[in-house]
């Protein structure tokens, strides 16, 4: 898969992105968290410790609050 494929998947799946401390929370359309999480892992895996996807929510753990802020900015740019 190409980066464009993952970007498109993310944009079609995600409703919102926010962060608190060293966590990023991504709200997705129902059933789309797992595919969106794969996209985030592929595109931004080097910016995080790990990720966990439920049905409509993704939790990402980063190294610190600054990394969470940077990742949130990158993810919101994809949605813009």
Where are these regions (language model features)?
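Ferredoxin-like alpha/beta domains used as RNA- or RNAP-binding modules
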Residues: 76-80
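Non-DNA-binding regulatory cores of transcription-related proteins
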Residues: 2-72
């Amino acid at each position: 898969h190409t980066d464009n494929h993952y970007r498109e998947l993310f944009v079609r799946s995600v409703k919102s992105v926010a962060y608190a401390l060293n966590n990023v929370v991504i709200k997705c359309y129902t059933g789309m968290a797992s595919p969106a999480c794969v996209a985030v892992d592929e595109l931004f895996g080097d910016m995080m410790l790990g990720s966990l996807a439920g049905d409509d929510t993704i939790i990402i753990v980063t190294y610190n609050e600054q990394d969470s802020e940077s990742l949130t900015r990158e993810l919101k740019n994809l949605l813009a």
